[in-house]
Design a protein with these regions (language model features):
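Serine-hydrolase catalytic machinery in alpha/beta-hydrolase-like enzymes
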Residues: 32-130, 149, 224-232
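Short alpha-helix in the alpha/beta-hydrolase fold that links the catalytic acid
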Residues: 74, 174, 183, 196-205
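Primarily recognizes the serine-hydrolase "nucleophile elbow" in alpha/beta-hydrolase
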Residues: 113-180
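Short beta-strand/loop motif that positions the catalytic acidic residue
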Residues: 181, 187-189
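Acidic catalytic loop of the alpha/beta-hydrolase fold
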Residues: 192-195, 222-223
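Catalytic histidine neighborhood in serine/cysteine hydrolases
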Residues: 208-225
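Catalytic active-site module of serine/aspartate enzymes centered on a nucleophile-bearing elbow/loop
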Residues: 229-252
Length: 252
């Protein structure tokens, strides 16, 4: 899968990478410009669902704090979803779009994600689809905060490594708002995630009585990396995660 020419020029460090999913090259993503306010916009990538497999679902994914939508993980998961019949959309938050490294304040992150949700709901190729939102780490957390405030149009949420608390600070939970989300949720969490272990996520789900499903990546860290001694190829880990997300999304 090659990047659109404009993005390839803007981010040359990612331009040469290609991804294949289940032996089949996915269609190239389309580029969308989403207006956030009168002066600012962000770039989104739409990975179209494979013909003949379309599920009538869109999954919007926000990136984590230390990457952008062109990271290997984001491109791989979006391509995998599309190959399995899910329309996938990724996007840059304003700070990454503008070449900055420090995440924006909460309100600015949320307003950006809310604008992307609106764009997905009204896009001519997606507006008949049901919508799932989420993302990697921070991207998933911001999606959850937006859904907690106003979940209109959101059929479900997918969290790929939910940052329940800062590493080493299990008392500083970022979970109080989750009880305000009415839509079903899927937590994909590494068993040894320093931002929230399987046990910690399971406790939040139980104590807050969330309409949630937990899929644990055995031996996985916050990036779902597993130790070589476990004998599980990393590509297999990622493929399994993608399969779980698709299975859960199609069942909504």
């Amino acid at each position: 899968m090659r990047l659109p020419v404009g993005l390839a020029r803007a981010f040359p460090e990612f331009a040469s990478n290609e991804y294949e999913v289940s032996g089949t090259k996915a269609m190239e993503p389309g580029t969308i410009t989403i207006t956030i306010n009168e002066r600012e916009s962000v770039t989104a990538l739409l990975y179209p669902a494979a013909q003949g497999k379309r599920a009538g679902m869109t999954v919007v994914l926000g990136h984590g704090a230390g990457a952008n939508q062109l990271s290997g993980f984001m491109r791989m998961i979006a391509t995998g979803l599309a190959a399995r019949g899910i329309d996938a959309m990724t996007f840059n938050f304003l700070y990454t779009e503008q070449g900055r490294h420090l995440p924006d304040p909460k309100a600015r992150l949320e307003s950006c994600y809310a604008a992307v949700i609106n764009a997905a709901l009204n896009h001519r190729k997606l507006k008949k689809n049901r919508l799932v939102i989420g993302g990697k780490s921070m991207g998933g957390r911001i999606a959850s905060q937006v859904a907690a405030a106003d979940g209109k149009g959101v059929a479900g949420l997918v969290f790929l490594g939910y940052p329940l608390h800062p590493p080493g600070k299990p008392d500083k939970l970022r979970a109080e708002h989750l009880k305000d989300i009415k839509a079903p949720m899927l937590f994909v969490q590494g068993a040894r995630d320093a931002f929230g272990t399987e046990e910690e996520i399971r406790a939040v789900i139980k104590n807050s009585r969330l309409p949630a499903t937990l899929y644990t990546v055995e031996g996985g860290d916050h990036s779902f990396k597993v130790a070589k001694r476990l004998g599980v190829p990393q590509d297999t880990v990622y493929e399994t995660i993608t399969d779980k997300v698709v299975e859960w999304t199609r069942a909504l």
